[in-house]
Amino acid sequence: MEHPLFGCLRSPHATAQGLHPFSQSSLALHGRSDHMSYPELSTSSSSCIIAGYPNEEGMFASQHHRGHHHHHHHHHHHHQQQQHQALQSNWHLPQMSSPPSAARHSLCLQPDSGGPPELGSSPPVLCSNSSSLGSSTPTGAACAPGDYGRQALSPADVEKRSGSKRKSDSSDSQEGNYKSEVNSKPRKERTAFTKEQIRELEAEFAHHNYLTRLRRYEIAVNLDLTERQVKVWFQNRRMKWKRVKGGQQGAAAREKELVNVKKGTLLPSELSGIGAATLQQTGDSLANEDSRDSDHSSEHAHL
């Protein structure tokens, strides 16, 4: 034997006789509050009535008429209640928990939406406030979001993205640490010598290219400088002197050669080279003369 509740859910044109036992229990909520023996079945039947079927007005009119009839004949309500208990004991209906009722309530409320949702709207959420049904279960357990378009990433992609993020973070941190170290190192300020200090240092350098520790200490005290500053100045001055001396020596040597060529005087090294060349030339000339004499003597012998 099929339960009238499932017939209500299946057939949109349910008759008033099939809804009579449940409508009486639902109307008991409006008449008196002490006859609430089946809250779950009353909520399911009321949810099916709210679903918006064609005989909706007729159902509400019949319920209103039966409500007045129930107030006048209270003993008839007790008789119907006993009959309903007997039917339930014969059918052996299982005890329905609150989550299925919440699911039925959500399914019955679904047709109330006025037309299809727009394309740009958010995905529908199949959730209803089950606190109105009197259930003690949390609403989050009966909620099912309808966002089915998103695709879950595979673990390999997640690991790749996390590894790339870690590498970028580590490189950024290393670059930041390097820049902070470079910026944190104080740059040594260049010592600004006065004209008087430079004059004294140049005079000392003209006499002594290298200083002793005692002389360096004396110059530092006289010029109000540190020994390190005096030492560094003499080191730089010696390097500059070597560069200038190398360039001056090359230029001076070329100038001397030009002057000596103009005057006709030669340097000792050049004289030694020229002497060897002249000796070689004289030897060659003597050899040529000897060969010529031998040729002449041979010619006279033939004559």
From Swiss-Prot:
Residues 86-100 have a biased composition (Polar residues). GO terms for cellular component: cytoplasm; nuclear speck; nucleus. Its main location: nucleus. Residues 63-191, 278-303 are annotated as: Disordered. Disruption phenotype: Mice display defective differentiation and morphogenesis of the limb muscles, characterized by an overall reduction in muscle mass and elimination of specific muscles. Embryos also display a cleft palate phenotype at 15.5 dpc. Mice lacking Meox1 and Meox2 show extremely disrupted somite morphogenesis, patterning and differentiation. They lack an axial skeleton and skeletal muscles are severely deficient. PROSITE patterns: HOMEOBOX_1 (PS00027), HOMEOBOX_2 (PS50071). Keywords: Activator, Developmental protein, DNA-binding, Homeobox, Nucleus, Transcription, Transcription regulation. Residues 111-136 have a biased composition (Low complexity). Disulfide bonds: none annotated. It is found in: Nucleus; Nucleus speckle. It comes from the Eukaryota. The keyword ATP-binding does not apply. Residues 63-81 have a biased composition (Basic residues). Mesodermal transcription factor that plays a key role in somitogenesis and somitogenesis and limb muscle differentiation. Required during limb development for normal appendicular muscle formation and for the normal regulation of myogenic genes. May have a regulatory role when quiescent vascular smooth muscle cells reenter the cell cycle. Also acts as a negative regulator of angiogenesis. Activates expression of CDKN1A and CDKN2A in endothelial cells, acting as a regulator of vascular cell proliferation. PANTHER family: HOMEOBOX PROTEIN MOX, HOMEOBOX PROTEIN MOX-2. The polyhistidine repeat may act as a targeting signal to nuclear speckles. This is Homeobox protein MOX-2. The gene is Meox2.
